[in-house]
């Protein structure tokens, strides 16, 4: 379990790396949580795994590799604070992945992972991000599409 000081540092790192250009994201898409999943794709959108890969490895957009290691050998300095993404698609279905990206605290209230598609209840939000999600509905679906393919 991470200490509160480590969690504060992680939140600060995430907030500091968010570029202003991405602050123009639209409001959140409506969704329904069923059990431990968001079964329906956000906005009825279809994700693209190649775009999802670009989001996951981009340390200015998804920021996933700051904490998660994964099957991206060309990416240096992957994190080791969060679960390995290598076989995440075998462990979790698309709905479970979607909920963890949209609002990981619904699954684990103690997580340091930010809610990527929520605007309420967030802590230490930069003014440029107030009222805006970190990822659009399309970006969430793209990341889900990628993660669902990671089955090794």
Question: What does each model-identified segment do?
Answer:
Residues 46, 50, 58, 91, ...:
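Soluble non-cytosolic domains of exported or imported proteins
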């Amino acid at each position: 379990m991470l200490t509160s000081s480590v969690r504060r540092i992680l939140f600060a790192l995430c907030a500091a790396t968010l570029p202003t250009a991405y602050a123009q994201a639209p409001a959140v898409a409506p969704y329904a949580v069923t059990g431990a999943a968001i079964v329906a794709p956000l906005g009825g959108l279809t994700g693209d795994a190649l775009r999802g890969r670009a989001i996951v490895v981009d340390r200015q957009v998804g920021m996933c590799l700051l904490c998660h290691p994964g099957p991206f050998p060309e990416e240096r300095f992957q994190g080791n604070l969060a679960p390995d993404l290598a076989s995440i698609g075998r462990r979790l279905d698309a709905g479970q992945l979607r909920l963890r990206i949209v609002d990981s605290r619904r699954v684990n209230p103690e997580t340091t992972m930010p809610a990527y598609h929520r605007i309420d209840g967030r802590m230490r939000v930069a003014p440029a991000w107030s009222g805006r999600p970190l990822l659009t509905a399309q970006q969430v679906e793209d990341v889900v599409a990628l993660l669902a393919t990671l089955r090794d």
